[in-house]
Amino acid sequence: MNNKVVGAAGEDLACRYLEKNGYKILERNKHYSRFCEIDIIAKFKDTVVFVEVKTRKTNSFGAPFEAITKSKYDNIRLGVQYYLSENKVKKYRIDVVGITLKPELKIEHL
């Protein structure tokens, strides 16, 4: 499984997890520039939630959350600012869903 396939599988799992927990998925893979993408935009109650999904096959090279660098976080924030400039949003937050596929499926939501 290449990284693109792993990432897409992780995003699918994250969407199912979020929906199961009361989130409504508004958009997926929203691109604002070559460097600026929001994996999932969802709504939970009255809050718009911007979700970054990090998926790893195993934890051999570290946990999924360790893949979020300052640069990546800055790009996520930039995407959020673009979205907010185009949409009326009163409440929002940024979440991260970390997924490890093996040895057993593990989904963590921060």
Label the predicted regions.
Residues I38-N59, I76:
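Conserved catalytic cores of phosphodiester-cleaving nucleases, focusing on short active-site segments
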Residues D12, T55-P103:
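Catalytic cores of nucleic-acid endonucleases
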Residues M1-R28:
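Acidic-basic catalytic patches of nuclease active cores, encompassing PD-(D/E)XK
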